[in-house]
Amino acid sequence: MWKSILAIALGAALGALLRWFLGLKLNSLLSSIPPGTLLANLVGGYVIGAAIAYFAQAPGIAPEWRLLIITGFCGGLTTFSTFSAEVVSLLQEGRLGWAAGAIATHVSGSLLMTLLGLFSMNWMLGK
């Protein structure tokens, strides 16, 4: 149990630090669709897709690795709450087109990156 808790906590801390760094460095570049938040969600989508594919091919790997990467790291990195707050802010400002664009970009981009992660990991593993 303690190994699982430690794996999740470590992964979450690393993911949250990366999300904070991306926001710090990139979000000021474009206020309408902050690129740090978008990149965090896209990278998280790719990583979770690749991890799912990898763990499906490596059933003998310790479960703590899955907890560290998927539950911890991807959970700490991706940010639905920040994305939601940014969209609500755009709506409150009357920027409906930007809000719709942000929703479409985050959702479709994250789904596509998850698929890309799955396919690329399966390709690398020869599956």
Curated annotation (Swiss-Prot):
Location in the cell: Cell inner membrane
Binding site for Na(+): 75, 78
Keyword Cell membrane in annotation: yes
Pfam families: CRCB
Chain segments annotated as transmembrane: 4-24, 36-56, 68-88, 99-119
Membrane-topology annotation of the record: Multi-pass membrane protein
Protein's job: Fluoride-specific ion channel. Important for reducing fluoride concentration in the cell, thus reducing its toxicity.
HAMAP family named in the record: FluC (MF_00454)
Protein name: Fluoride-specific ion channel FluC
Name of the gene this protein is made from: fluC
